[in-house]
A protein has these predicted regions:
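Charge-dense, helix-prone N-terminal extensions
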Residues: 1-144
Length: 144
């Protein structure tokens, strides 16, 4: 089943379409909740799952056999630790069971925090590539 939203990027729509309709609906709800708070973010597949990216990864989400996974990073888990007690969570991930209602308000608060945290951090330039040694002797060696 293709996404009902024609603006869903093709790789994301393909990812979502691979799941049963009830899981697709949950993935779309998570996507829309995050998109509302990260309108400038680019959507892409990273680590084989849907990702919102804005100079760096903001937040990922994914579907599994028994849960929807949300991956906001370790710092977000620490900030929202008290609100996450009802859910399985680890260093940078949260599991929302498929048989329970999605906590969309919590997902939006986490997404808003991720956007704010990202906007507060400068985007670092990629590291400069070291120059190539000229053909000939290796550094520190002389020719005879």
């Amino acid at each position: 089943m293709e996404s009902s939203n024609p603006t869903t990027p093709a790789p994301i729509a393909t990812y979502i379409a691979a799941f049963p309709p009830e899981v697709q609906a949950r993935l779309l709800a998570v996507r829309e909740a995050i998109r509302a708070l990260a309108p400038r973010a680019e959507e892409r597949i990273s680590y084989s799952i849907p990702t919102f990216w804005q100079g760096r990864n903001l937040i990922h989400y994914a579907a599994f056999a028994r849960h929807i996974g949300l991956y906001p990073g370790a710092a977000a888990i620490e900030v929202f630790r008290a609100e996450l007690q009802a859910y399985r969570h680890a260093r940078g991930s949260i599991q929302f069971p498929l048989q329970e209602p999605l906590p969309l308000a919590l997902i939006q608060r986490i997404a808003a925090w991720c956007v704010d945290n990202n906007n507060a951090r400068p985007v670092s330039a990629p590291p400069a590539r070291p120059g190539r040694a000229s053909a000939g002797a290796a550094p520190g060696r002389t020719r005879r």
